[in-house]
Every structure is written in structure tokens, then in C-alpha cells.
Regions:
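Structural register within alpha-helical repeat arrays
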Residues: 6, 13, 46-47, 67, ...
């Protein structure tokens, strides 16, 4: 199975766990999805939101840095890449600001 497919399947499982309010399992599977350098934004978005709710800024920053790395490396004509990259960069600045306020 290709890494994209593994990431996609992990993302689907995470979504199901989150839907069923099993946040710990959802985080586990979103983390698994991004470990495969999955290039869909959903697991990165959800992890940053879940970590922000916990005020776990270190993990939020780690996930955002990973997202920026993954989306910066995509060599494609996809028109959604730059807006996503900008969104991740803005969120990273906000997370760093919040962390520094602790």
C-alpha cells in the first residue's frame, strides 16, 4: 500500500473516532496519517485544533511545522497548495505567540 493510501486510511479512522467522541484514538490516527506525509490538510487541521483546545502548543507547533514541510514539498499544479501553506504559516505564528504567553 502506498503511503498516501495508508495516510488516507488512517485519516478516515481518525475521523470516525472523533465523530464517536474518542479524542485520544482520533489523535493517535491523525498522527499516524501525518506520519505518512499525507498531503490532505484535514489531519493537520484537526490535530492543531485538538491540541489548541488542550493548550498543548508544543504539539500544535510541531504539527504545523510538519504541515508546512509537507505542503512546501508538493510538486503539483494543485491550486490549493499556496492558500493552505499560508494558512498553516499564520496558525504557526499564532501558536508561537500563545506559547510565549504561557
Amino acid at each position: 500500500m502506498l503511503n498516501f493510501e495508508k495516510g488516507y486510511q488512517a485519516n478516515l479512522k481518525a475521523m470516525e473516532y472523533e465523530k464517536n467522541k474518542d479524542i485520544e484514538k482520533a489523535i493517535e490516527f491523525y498522527e499516524k496519517a501525518i506520519s505518512y506525509n499525507f498531503d490532505g490538510n484535514y489531519p493537520y487541521d484537526r490535530l492543531t485544533i485538538l491540541y489548541r483546545k488542550r493548550k498543548d502548543y508544543n504539539n500544535e507547533i510541531r504539527v504545523l511545522n510538519k504541515a508546512i514541510k509537507v505542503f512546501s514539498s508538493i510538486k503539483s499544479d494543485r491550486c490549493d497548495i499556496n492558500p493552505k501553506l499560508e494558512k498553516f504559516k499564520q496558525r504557526l505564528l499564532k501558536a508561537q505567540t500563545l506559547k510565549n504567553k504561557q
